[in-house]
Amino acid sequence: MFAVAAVTQSTDDPLSGLHVGDIDEPPVPEDWVSIDVVTCALNHHDLWSLKGVGLPGDRLPMILGCDAAGQAPDGAEVLVYPVISSPGFQGDVTNDPRRSLLSEVYPGTLAERVRVPAGNLVPKPEGLSWEQAACLPTAWLTAYRMLFTNAAVHPGDTVLVQGAGGGVATAAIQLAEAAGLRVWATSRDAAKRDLAKDLGATETFESGARLPDRVDAVMETVGAATWSHSVNSLRPGGTIVISGATSGDAPAKAELTKIFFKQLRVIGSTMGTRDELARLARFVADKGIEPQIDSVLPLAQARTGFERMAAGDVGGKIVFRV
């Protein structure tokens, strides 16, 4: 089976461990189904796996990828929900301490076929293209839960999105604008600030710039580099929702005094539930949102996509056609 896999790991040269080509096809576990992948997409999670983060070396080789859309055995067009719960777990799977993402314990989506529990399939709305559908299961689902479940923002509220340009950030901008929120975004890069405006941001600012007003919520994925700015940008009683720390997880100042004095809420957010993915897909289709796609490549050119992501030269999702 043709697939993209991690065969070795390196923090200094992660792409040295990337294999693009044929690999032995894994068996289908009992009560799981095999999906013929039509499109799949890249996430920073895949780069971290190549660096040895979240993927122990004894599980190599491991097919990478968390995002996919394809056809079920009955011909249905589906999105793949990539969170695998532990046996017998009940409730919100994002709170399952033994949960995993595809490509951590079980083979991922960057392949001709992917195996998942039958309950992990979500119908693909007719209004979504295959390329758009592949964008949703990881970055877009993360942004959806951040905004609508954890920040609990309402039309007319002001949301600050830190680090415009990445997959979660671009998704948050597009989703927030479609929901009637006022969206402000930051980036060090002028081109990415322009992209944020094109996607629906009302205003854009250089990273760390003083804002004209306090905001109701901050969508934080950058971490250490923007943490103090996020805290200082909130109105009293406002909310920071954090789902990543690409610049590091140890800010120079924790800002604890400001957090308790201003009664700020700091909420961690990881992925989302299958039901949230279904609602997200319906919302995107109903609102006519076109997820920002940086590029579409054949899966055989996956290395090019990985190289661009590693260089930070990305504005939106990188999608692969199988």
Where do the protein language model's features map onto the residues?
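Glycine-rich beta-strand-centered segment in the early N-terminal region that forms part
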Residues: 24-41, 53-94, 102-107, 125-127
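NAD(P)H dinucleotide-binding glycine-rich loop of Rossmann-like/cofactor-binding domains
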Residues: 82-163
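N-terminal Rossmann-like NAD(P) cofactor-binding module of classical short-chain dehydrogenase/reductase
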Residues: 79, 218-219, 241
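Mid-domain Rossmann-like dinucleotide-binding core that forms the NAD(H)/NADP(H) cofactor-binding site
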Residues: 77, 132-209
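A short acidic, Gly/Pro-enriched loop at the edge of an enzyme's catalytic core
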Residues: 210-218
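N-terminal Rossmann-fold cofactor-binding loop
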Residues: 186-190, 221, 244, 270
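C-terminal capping/lid region of NAD(P)-dependent oxidoreductase domains
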Residues: 1-2, 212, 288-292, 304-322
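Glycine-rich phosphate-binding loop and adjacent beta-alpha segment
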Residues: 179, 225-292, 321-322
